[in-house]
Amino acid sequence: MKKHRWILMMSILFLCPSLCLAAPAKVEVVPAVTAEAAVVMDMDTGEVLYGKHEHEQRPPASLTKVMTGYLAVKQGRLQQTVTVSETAASTGESSLNLKTGDQLTFENLLYGALMKSANDACVALAEQMAGSEAVFVQNMNLQACLLGCSNTNFCNSNGLPAENHYSSAYDLAVMTRAAMQEELFAHIVQQQKYRVRWSDGRHLLVQNTNRLLREYPGAIGVKTGTTNEAGQCLIAVAEKEGKRIIVVVLKSKNRFYDAVALLDYGLSAERKSGILNNRTETGQLSASA
């Protein structure tokens, strides 16, 4: 009887060699991140490659400035001179330290807003474009709606804490995807340094707050954001071999570490950059930087 069983088993194996040769199923390793919400999006197709509470409404801090910058570059008033109002000059936290009556070109304010995360520059731009920040915010929300961002409501142009001011990781990726189609926006957010110039000859060298531009091969933008309520936030874009990936992380314990893990995941499952270790960023939080 045992001999017959052995012959039967050998016959089955002989007739079905695929049973022996079948490779084990490949298990995709999803990156572990500290962010409470995150998304990875293919910038060319809009496909979501990874999501973690990506539709959850959260304070976006200075990631708000992506929409402000997007609307600004679409208006194309680059060489127009802007006179800084008292309202803009009094806007606190991260800023260019603008004074009432200062004059700068629209372009210089735009660089200050997107690279240095200057809150005062955002208000000056908003007032120049729409007459008041309140009216400009209506335009921001309209544009968000047109892009299909259903979990977004802006209350100001810079992302400073405000009741009912929120967005989601997914919506912010959608906004970034649209903004990066604008050549000037894509150029500005990729710059590491820029000298902001006032009309009277004063100038200020600003450095991009996005350190991935200096540390992650292929990084081409976009924006940092930090408030006590929002935590560490970041939108990052990188490209490799023709593939472009958008990463958004919200309320992260280490936004740059999380972004690297998600960019690596989106660009190539095998790629290991190893440029950032898993250390939590510490220090005073600068509101909406």
Give each language-model segment a name.
Residues 19, 139, 209:
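Non-catalytic cell-wall polysaccharide-engagement segments
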